[in-house]
């Protein structure tokens, strides 16, 4: 934690009032914190603060105690309790040590990191920039505290969608830490985790996996397999494998992240919600819609309570629930979820963030399901423009946007506009995700349906067959997407008077849907 840097500053040993030592609870709190026992650390730091205040309200040790107590609160997800402590610590440190002291910078970094966690990005940035300027001037450009502030600023820029800036800072922080601290230091793992999170967003999957696995190994070795610090790389690995279509591999790290979070931090902690959100997305992709909704609703409740109703993480969960509702053909539920997510994101992230594009795509899906084509088209087009600009023209998210827009055009009989969009979506998916990815299969189904609408039956049939092969392999034979493809293929067979085969396909689709609707045993 950034705030722990406060505790590293040398303080002359001096017995507190009544012969009680301030250093004793500080050291005990530091040990508990490093071991991930944050509630215990909180109690020790509170005791240290009480003893420090006996030395005088403006004593630098009061600022140190406040900073560490705030770090414990933040680790516990109690952001509202942490902020006033850090602001008081900053006032004391500036008054006692001057505005350019490293302890002032450490407190500024802690405040900035807290602001980022709270979704208050505009407030966080100037704090972090001031901290970085102090650290570089006073400590030198290769000091570990410079790396800590660089990492905090990179995390903020990543959350804001400023990926180029974030990468430069993350790489610099990693280089400093590896040089000064060694490759197996836990602070190196923090830089690795931040860089892995960035690369996952950019679909740089090979680099993401290497960095996340290395971060996890460092933290497991240094801290143990059940320390809260292992949660973040596990969540990244779960997200990564899910996006790659490696669903069995995705579930294990995501479930482990949830178990660690619930045990170490409690079931209502934001870290638990992050793991739940990954599991909800995984269940949604695998066609386990009831499970996905339960997980998503639980994540939403945690995030709304812990972070507030307008936090960007709340919007992320809302967007996932909107996507789920659209998959279940529940447009009336999907649209308000997508609109609420979009409103939060435009307010907190700006109008051109990739998360805004995701909510726009979900909104477009809801509108398309309601035959509100004139409203859906600008939503899809805006999502595509954002993703191309912020993520690049070959991002898998761009492929999703293209496919959605292509389907809208197909439903409007705008076939000449639809086909190149599908073709481009397919090419992106095959290149970035691989030719057997479920997203590629879904695009092939849509392309086949386009050909069917144009009576290009000889071209459509092998595409349906190919897509079904891919979907059964990747998703399993009983997935709702398989049922949908069977129904589309059956419609083609009817059009070419192969009624018996069509009936067989429809029967298979009905069996899948009946099985999915049956209560779990």
Residue ranges of model-derived segments:
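Intrinsic-disorder-linked linear interaction elements in eukaryotic regulatory proteins
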Residues: 1-521
């Amino acid at each position: 934690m950034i705030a722990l840097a406060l505790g590293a500053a040398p303080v002359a040993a001096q017995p507190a009032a009544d012969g009680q030592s301030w250093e004793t609870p500080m050291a005990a709190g530091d040990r508990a914190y490093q071991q991930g026992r944050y509630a215990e650390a909180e109690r020790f730091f509170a005791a240290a603060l009480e003893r420090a205040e006996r030395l005088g309200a403006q004593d630098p040790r009061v600022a140190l105690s406040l900073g560490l107590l705030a770090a414990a609160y933040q680790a516990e997800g109690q952001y509202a309790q942490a902020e006033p402590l850090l602001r008081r610590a900053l006032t004391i440190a500036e008054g006692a040590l001057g505005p350019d002291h490293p302890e002032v910078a450490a407190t500024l970094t802690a405040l900035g990191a807290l602001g980022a966690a709270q979704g208050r990005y505009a407030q966080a940035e100037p704090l972090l920039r001031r901290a970085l300027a102090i650290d570089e001037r006073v400590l030198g450009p290769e000091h570990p505290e410079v790396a800590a502030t660089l990492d905090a600023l990179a995390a903020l820029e990543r959350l804001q969608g400023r990926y180029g800036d974030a990468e430069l800072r993350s790489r610099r922080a990693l280089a400093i830490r590896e040089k000064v601290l060694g490759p197996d230091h836990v602070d190196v793992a923090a830089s690795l985790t931040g860089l892995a999170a960035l690369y996952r967003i950019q679909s740089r999957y090979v680099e993401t996996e290497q960095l996340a696995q290395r971060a996890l190994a460092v933290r497991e070795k240094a801290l143990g397999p059940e320390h809260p610090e292992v949660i973040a790389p596990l969540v990244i690995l779960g997200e990564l494998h899910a996006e790659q279509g490696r669903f069995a591999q995705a579930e294990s790290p995501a479930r482990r992240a949830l178990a660690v979070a619930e045990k170490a931090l409690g079931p209502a902690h934001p870290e638990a919600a992050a793991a739940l959100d990954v599991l909800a997305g995984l269940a949604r992709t695998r066609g386990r819609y009831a499970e996905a909704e339960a997980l998503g609703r639980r994540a939403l409740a945690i995030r709304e309570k812990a972070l507030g109703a307008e936090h960007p993480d709340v919007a992320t969960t809302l967007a996932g629930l909107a996507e789920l509702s659209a998959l279940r053909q529940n447009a009336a539920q999907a649209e308000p979820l997508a609109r609420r997510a979009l409103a939060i994101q435009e307010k907190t992230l700006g109008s051109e963030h990739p998360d805004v594009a995701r909510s726009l795509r979900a909104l477009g899906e809801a509108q398309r399901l309601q035959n509100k084509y004139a409203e859906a088209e600008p939503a899809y087009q805006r999502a595509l423009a954002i993703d191309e600009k912020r993520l690049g023209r070959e991002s898998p998210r761009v492929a999703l946007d293209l496919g959605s827009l292509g389907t809208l055009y197909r439903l409007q009989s705008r076939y000449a506009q639809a086909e190149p969009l599908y073709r481009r979506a397919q090419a992106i998916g095959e290149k970035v995700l691989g030719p057997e990815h479920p997203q590629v299969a879904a695009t092939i189904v849509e392309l086949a349906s386009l050909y069917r609408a144009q009576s290009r039956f000889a071209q459509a049939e092998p595409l349906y067959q190919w897509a079904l092969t891919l979907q059964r392999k990747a998703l399993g034979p009983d997935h709702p997407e398989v049922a949908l493809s069977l129904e589309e293929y059956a419609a083609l067979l009817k059009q070419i008077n192969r009624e018996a085969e069509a009936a067989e396909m429809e029967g298979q689709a009905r069996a899948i849907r009946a099985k999915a609707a049956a209560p779990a045993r």
